[in-house]
Each structure stands twice: as structure tokens, then as C-alpha cells.
């Protein structure tokens, strides 16, 4: 049996469960696959299979993540669930599993707990754009007023962290009851069906990479006699057509040029698009004007910045990270896309140091500007080894 071919008939959305430990994230994930499976939209993945998620390495960081997939009438979902709290933090910060939306699971028996807060804050910081709430274990709460109270508390917490708390769908149910039923039309399965409907209607279809403004991180620069300068790299998003204007952004002053040729596998094309490894021929550019670490981009689509706020996970000693804490004034390298740039870290007021294994929010000032926008991922390196992973949460200047 070869691998099944992935049939792309429906739009694809990446989603995941977040929330406090033991509030039922994994049970809900299993229940979704079961109910979707009973409705003929995927195959059931049992709790134990999800719970013993294999460990994966993302930029040298070990993360345990379970991936399941299921469909609704209109969409194909890829869903991530992490067994441990630390795995969530690493997952969200490294972007190992980019989420177009998240399902926040809150046990009605407990209400919002510390990790509920932390996951909402992280979702905000790393740019998970939409959340839907599943109020779990509602079968264990007899008091309707108590349910109302917990729902209100969750909505207020979401608003506090910048999500539209009043508008977010909140579905009440029991993940365990949904997991135990074999009838997709039963009252026990209904909340999971309602949750899937809420995901379909509330989480917008993500814009595809190809529809975004053109951007290609520059990996290499060649000069071809009689033709000019060629920059190579993998197109991250958008489309570049021969004859279009482009900008070279980052490290130095922004320079304008025109793309006079696109080639791939030594063949000339009239355009390159997201995912293609291409060489782009640039008019009027000298080889020494361009370097690895800059980006080729659609005019005015991205600006260079030096100072930003970051949400960062610092590798533990066991993951090959530092053995000692660092303090304000620490100067490691920040690896953005294709290159390392030195930066100086300023910890938040009242934070004395950051220990290996911590996640932290701090400010970074680079020695040279990089083409940057909110949500850009980076690695922190020291002498060539990765000691942290982060995401730009806010641009300061």
C-alpha cells in the first residue's frame, strides 16, 4: 500500500486546541475526530494515540505534538494537540504548527486557570488570529447560573487580552460524552457538531501564501557577465512576474529595481510563485549592492526595523541550550530567514534574568535593520548553536 494521495478539494485550515492542563483538550480532539468520522468526514483517532504524541524537533527544540485531520462539509482541517504545557509554549513560539485559529478549552468545573490565561496571551502574542471556546464538562455542573458565570469570565479574559470576547462563539458540552457516543445525531454529539460549525463560520479561510504580496529572502547573489546581477532564494509568498518593480529591503538602505528575468532549474519563466526556488535577474544592481539576509519584495510591502518586542522560548540545558541565565545587555545573534544579526536584549522592568527553559517577553535592538513584520519568527544563536526561538510580537521602531 503506497501513501494515500492528498486530494485537495476543500480549503485547508490549520487549527489546534489550547487551554489549561486536564481541562479536556485531548479528549475533545479525540471526540472531534470521532464525530467527524461518524459523519463520514475522516477517521477516528483514539485518546491514547493523541496523548502519546511523538516528539519532533523544530530548530533543535524538542516538541511533542499530535497531528490529526478531519473534514467538515466545506473544509479540511489539520489539528494540533500537545500533551504538555511546555510543548504548547514551544509550539506556539516556534510556529512549528502555524494556527489559523484555535479552540480554547475551558472546564466549566474550574473556570479559567493560570494556563488558560497564558495560552490566550501567547495566542495574542504569536498572532493566532481567531479563537473559538469549548466550555467542557458542562454535564458536571447542574447550576445554569454557574455556567453563565464561567462563560462571562472567559469572555472577559479574552477581551482583556485583545480578542473580541463578546463576539467569540462559546459552545457548551462534554467532550467525554461526545467521545462515548456512536450516534453523530445524538444530544451528546451535538456540541461537537456545533463546535465544528462555529469553526467553519467564525474562523475565516486563511489567505493563501500565493495571494499575499511578493517576498523572497535572498540566499545568494551572482553576477552574470553581460546580463547583470541574479539573486536566488525560495519565494516565501506572492508572485513575481518579469518586468515588475521590486525593492531590496534590510541591512542597508532600501533600493528599487526591476526584475528582468526569472529562472528555475536553468529554465526561463515568466513568473515565480510561493514555494518556488528561483533566480531573479535585477536591472541596474551591482553584485556588491545586495547580500544574503536582505529580502526581495513587492514595493512598499515590508519595511526594515531594528527595535522590536519579542516572545521567546529559551532552550533548556537538556535541549542543548545555555547552562546559565542571561541578563539585560546580553548580545547574541538573531537568525532571521537566512542570516544572523547581532542584537542587544533589554529585559522587562522587574525581570532580573531569564533562565534556560523559560519563556519570556523582552525588547531587542539589532545592530542593522531587517525586513520585519509582526509574527516573524527567528532563532537566537550563540557561536552557531541555537539557544532560543522567538517571534516578533510588536515592532517598536
UniProtKB/Swiss-Prot annotation:
GTP binds at residues 19-26, 81-85, 136-139. Residues 81-84 are annotated as: G3. The keyword Magnesium applies. Residues 10-207 form the tr-type G domain. It is an enzyme of class 3 (hydrolase). CDD domains: EF_Tu, EFTU_II, EFTU_III. Mg(2+) binds at residue 26. GO terms for cellular component: cytosol. Residues 19-26 are annotated as: G1. Pfam families: GTP_EFTU (PF00009), GTP_EFTU_D2 (PF03144), GTP_EFTU_D3 (PF03143). It is found in: Cytoplasm. Residues 136-139 are annotated as: G4. Coiled coil: none annotated. One of its GO terms (molecular function) is GTPase activity. Residues 174-176 are annotated as: G5. Residues 60-64 are annotated as: G2. Its EC number is 3.6.5.3. It catalyses: GTP + H2O = GDP + phosphate + H(+). Disulfide bonds: none annotated. It comes from the Bacteria. Monomer. GTP hydrolase that promotes the GTP-dependent binding of aminoacyl-tRNA to the A-site of ribosomes during protein biosynthesis. This is Elongation factor Tu. It comes from Nitratidesulfovibrio vulgaris (strain DSM 19637 / Miyazaki F). The gene is tuf.
